């Protein structure tokens, strides 16, 4: 949390249920802009968004963009992000790489990027997702901001691979 608040990158290796989500949720509420949370599962994104909305009077505080949304729902998300209501925007790596989303995010003040389930980056990991390998080049295209990578499962080899790729 301290690293993010001071504009530095962070790597978090913490057991399931240990509070990894809080490591990016708390700074997102304090910092200017919107935090981009890269997450591999639609169900996980929905749960996180629902949990954040339950704690806020502002329903636009958290959103996700993925293939399950209609055009009008995506427009609503974008309006909330542009108006400054949204502090957390969850995206799958596949959505992050879409040109229309890259162009949109280039016009947004991003506080930081959170890479949840970061072990998916590593070829050495059990849940390797090739799209995760493209996160750093996409961030370079969208705009620089601190990165926090979070995982519960990473051998030293996987940890090194994550840090090297981000």
Please describe what each predicted stretch is.
Residues 1-15, 23-26:
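Conserved pre-motif I regulatory segment
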Residues 2, 46, 50, 75, ...:
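ASCE RecA-like P-loop NTPase motor cores
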Residues 6-12, 32-34, 85-87, 145-146:
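Pre-Walker A (Motif I) flank of P-loop NTPase domains
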Residues 18, 25, 50, 69-112, ...:
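Conserved helix/coil segment N-terminal to the catalytic DExD/H
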Residues 22, 33-55, 67-69, 73, ...:
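Conserved Walker A/P-loop ATP-binding site and its immediately adjacent core
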Residues 28-30, 54-58, 79-84, 103-108, ...:
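Conserved catalytic network of the ASCE P-loop NTPase/AAA+ motor domain
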Residues 106-166:
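Post-DEXD/H (motif II) to motif III coupling segment of the RecA-like Helicase ATP-binding lobe
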